[in-house]
Amino acid sequence: MNKNVLYRSIPKVDILLADEGIKVLIEAYSRESVMEAIHSEMEKLRAYIGTCDDEEKAKHQIALLNENIAKAVAAMHTPNMKKVINGTGTILHTNLGRAPISYEHMMKAAEIVSGYSNLEYNLEAGRRGERYSHFEKLLCKLTGAEAAMAVNNNASSVLLILSSLAKGGEVIVSRGELIEIGGKFRIPDVMEQSGASLVEVGTTNKTHYEDYEEAITEETKALLKVHTSNYRIVGFTESVGIDELVPIAKEHEIPVVEDLGSGVLIDLEKYGLTHEPTVQESIAHGADVVCFSGDKLLGGPQAGIIIGKKKYIDMMKKNQLTRALRIDKFTAAALEMVLMEYLSEETAVQNIPVLRMIATPLEEIEKEARSFVRILRHTGMDAKIQMVSCESQIGGGSLPLERMESRAAIQPNGMSVAEMEEKMRHLEIPIIPRTINDSICLDVRTIERKDYKMIAAELAELLGKKEER
């Protein structure tokens, strides 16, 4: 095998540019994109020939050069971020975007932000306004807080709160609440960035009322309570609640801040889950400032929502960090749309996808699974399809011990689970499954009914028909 001959047989750039198919690509995209693809694919081809020991395979790859250039150009102009089907049963899947936002809410928000809007314009007064005004009254009405604002995520909330209330001073927090929120971002590190000094009290499993009292000095600027929404310590434990911290803080004239993490506005116990502290409860117990995520149990866009006493919220609004951390117009619009649903709990559970998934009873899940299985079987795909029991979970650092009984459609077939899972990730609309006992499963709790037929069609194309095998 003479590799020099193979290298010389690769078409030169000017010959490729004269090709009719390449000319069509230039017209459809741009000369710059096509040239980039040509150079990239030629480099890959040379590298392949350099390691290939099969002359016929090398010639075949040379013959595919134009086709590969076309694919490369198309890939350059195809958005990398795309819709995926979440078949994992994890409702708040961090890697899949956490809370899905309803199509209706997004369309309403898109209508507002696709043109000009009154984002920071007071239509009544005819002058500059606040971007928080669109949802501040709603948040106060729903939670009982005096004032509210939002920044780009909940870590930003903690950063802004501590920078505004405790910069240069000390903040007391229980050792059992020094959480890591994912991606190695930790509460102590966020506190350090705020300019506040951390004072740890208690132990990992036990912190007492007296621990806070004894740690307060003239340098103490706030007491911080962090709800461990992404893990639980069980067994020989004790912690100090907000209602116990408030009297201590009042005595020393310092604020109590609670980071609720996932943040929930309705009691989830009525839907079969254990009690998760609500935002309203925190305010009712006397917390001066409360922060929580917008894209977790609230079911909205990514945001760090801050509510509490007006004097403290006003301090944060004036902090120079606020401009760096502020939310954009799309987030502001989407957040208002989602919060409006909470004016009626029944409406919220129906129209906010996260709440609907959580609240759907097992009987309804079974009905959906049977319907999904029928659609899958109707395609005649080469697979054994059946309904199996499984457990869904909340995910996203929320209610870590909770599992909800669910149902999944399962497709064992001729290819291995690893091979099928890999192929599903590369479909036009990727499908992200879970595996149970070495089988591919699709949990219907996190799959929308409108996607059943599309999923069935994609899998049928992937697996082929039974008679074709």
Question: Where are each of the predicted segments found?
Answer:
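Glycine-rich phosphate-binding segment of PLP-dependent enzymes
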Residues: 43, 47, 87-88, 98-124
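Conserved PLP-enzyme active-site core in the AAT-like
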Residues: 126-342, 458
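A short linear hydrophobic-aromatic micro-motif
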Residues: 80-81, 148, 429-434
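Structural motif of enzymes handling amino- and sulfur-group chemistry
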Residues: 311, 319-320, 327-378, 388-391, ...
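Long amphipathic alpha-helical segments
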Residues: 1-73
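Long amphipathic N-terminal alpha/beta scaffold segment
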Residues: 51-101, 107-108
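Short Gly/Ser/Thr- and Asp/Glu-enriched loop/turn motifs at secondary-structure junctions
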Residues: 10-11, 85-89, 298-301, 404, ...
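Conserved C-terminal alpha-helix-loop-beta "cap" of PLP-dependent enzymes
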Residues: 362, 366-450, 454-455
